[in-house]
Regions:
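Charged docking surfaces used in two-component/phosphorelay signaling
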Residues: 12-23
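Acidic catalytic/metal-coordinating carboxylates
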Residues: 32-36, 59-62, 86
Length: 230
C-alpha cells in the first residue's frame, strides 16, 4: 500500500483529501504545517506529498526546499493563488505539480495516481537486461533508472527523468511544449508553457556544465526542445 502525506493547516481540507485517497486504497498520513510534515517524512516511508503553500511555522514552499535536499518523492502543491508567478515559484522550489484551490477532489486524485505511476517506475531498481540510451557523455540506464553525465551520477525527480528520457530516446527530434506535456502528463496541454519550461530549466541545471550554453538539451526557438545527436 502506497503512503501519501497530506499537509494543510485547514483540517477540513486534510480530512476531505483523506476520504478520497483512502477510498482509492492509499494510506494517508496527516500534518498541519511544514515542520510537522518534515517530522512525518523523517519517521515514515512516504511515497507522495500533497502540501499547502500558506501555513504557520513553516510554509509549503520552504518545506519543499528542505525536502528536496533529501528526497525525490513526488510533491503536489496546493494553493489558493492561481497566478503564473506563484506556479513558477512552486515548481522552482522542486514541486512536481501544482493544484489551485478550490479543486475538484477527483482531479487531485487523478494527479496523485499519475505522479505515483512515474515514481514507482523510477524506483524500480531490478535490472533484467540493459536498456541504455546515450548522447555523448549523457547516459541513461532505463532499467536501473540512473542518469550519469561524464560518469557522474545525476539525481532527477520522476518528471525530470521522464522528460529527459523522452528527448534522449528521440535524439534529433524537436518536441513542442505541448508534445512534451501530453507525453509526460498524459493529459491535454492547457497552459503548459510555464510548467514544461521550469522542468527543462531544472534538467539543464543538473546535466549541463553551463546551462546558459547547453551541450545536450537545446531549444529550437519558436518550435520546442531537443537533444542533439552526439
Amino acid at each position: 500500500m502506497e503512503t501519501i502525506l497530506v499537509c494543510d493547516d485547514d483540517r477540513e481540507i486534510v480530512e476531505a483529501i483523506d476520504i478520497y485517497l483512502s477510498q482509492e486504497g492509499y494510506k494517508v498520513l496527516k500534518a498541519y504545517d511544514g515542520i510537522e510534515a518534515l517530522e512525518v517524512l523523517k519517521n515514515n516511508e512516504v511515497h507522495l506529498l500533497v502540501i499547502d503553500v500558506m501555513m504557520p511555522r513553516l510554509d509549503g514552499l520552504r518545506a519543499t526546499l528542505k525536502i528536496r535536499q533529501e528526497s525525490s518523492i513526488p510533491i503536489i502543491i496546493l494553493s489558493a493563488k492561481s497566478e503564473d508567478a506563484d506556479k513558477i515559484l512552486g515548481l522552482n522550489v522542486g514541486a512536481d505539480d501544482y493544484v489551485t484551490k478550490p479543486f475538484n477532489p477527483l482531479e487531485l486524485t487523478a494527479r496523485v495516481k499519475s505522479q505515483l505511476r512515474r515514481y514507482t517506475k523510477l524506483g524500480n531498481k531490478t535490472a533484467v537486461n540493459d536498456s541504455i540510451y546515450q548522447a555523448g557523455g549523457l547516459v541513461i540506464n532505463d532499467e536501473l533508472k540512473e542518469v550519469t553525465v561524464d560518469g557522474e551520477h545525476v539525481k532527477l525527480t520522476p518528471i525530470e527523468y521522464n522528460i529527459l528520457l523522452l528527448l534522449v530516446k528521440n535524439q534529433g527530434k524537436v518536441f513542442s511544449i505541448n508534445q512534451i506535456y501530453e507525453s509526460i502528463w498524459n493529459e491535454e496541454a492547457i497552459g503548459a508553457d510555464i510548467t514544461v519550461a521550469v522542468h527543462i530549466r531544472h534538467i539543464r541545471e543538473k546535466i549541463e556544465g553551463n546551462p546558459n550554453d547547453p551541450r545536450y538539451l537545446k531549444v529550437v526557438w519558436g518550435v520546442g526542445y531537443m537533444i542533439e545527436k552526439q
